[in-house]
Amino acid sequence: DLHLLSRRQRQMCIRDSVITAEYQEFYLVNVYTPNSQRGLERLDYRQIWEDAFRDYLLKLDQIKPVLVCGDLNVAHREIDLKNWKTNRNNAGFTDEERAKMTELLTAGFTDSFRHLYPEKEGAYTWWSYMFKAREKNAGWRIDYWLVSDRWADRIEDSVIYADITGSDHCPVGLVLK
């Protein structure tokens, strides 16, 4: 359904890892959001990309509910990373990136994990390979399941499988009624 977007938006989405599967009742969108990079070298590009991605999701959502899963490369709230004070204005925790996440949620999507566990601390999906970060659980929650607001009441559980290793990220799961 990339045909719903302009040519430029399609190119941006395709290049930066968006895969969409259509099912009878919903769309499933898997995404890797561009990282702003050290020194925020790609922050401007990311902001444009985020607008295009949000517009794409909203167009899909007009047709049927949307489930979004993937690495959104943003810790939305201070509770979503261990060391938020020292990471302020680093890639993944800038005011701009967090504002774009807020815009996406406000536009009609629910963060499934925070919907069920609004104040749960220590729930992370990514840890640096340095400084024994995983062992110390000094991580970030940057992998999400987002659900169209109209399906928020169908969220039964949103799971972070922190014990599964093999990557600097861990899997996340979603259970719907």
Go through each PLM region and give its residues.
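Metal-dependent phosphoesterases centered on the DNase I-like endonuclease/exonuclease/phosphatase
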Residues: 49-138, 142
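A short, charged helix-loop
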Residues: 31, 36-41
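Active-site beta-strand termini and strand-to-loop segments that position acidic
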Residues: 21-24, 148-149, 174-177
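Short hydrophobic/aromatic beta-strand or adjacent loop that forms the aromatic wall/cage
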Residues: 15-20, 141-143, 169-173
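Single conserved hydrophobic/aromatic residue that forms the stacking wall/gate
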Residues: 1-10, 14
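Surface polyanion/phosphate-binding segment centered on an Asp-His-Pro turn
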Residues: 159-177
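Beta-strand-turn-beta hairpins that frame and shape the catalytic cleft
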Residues: 15-32
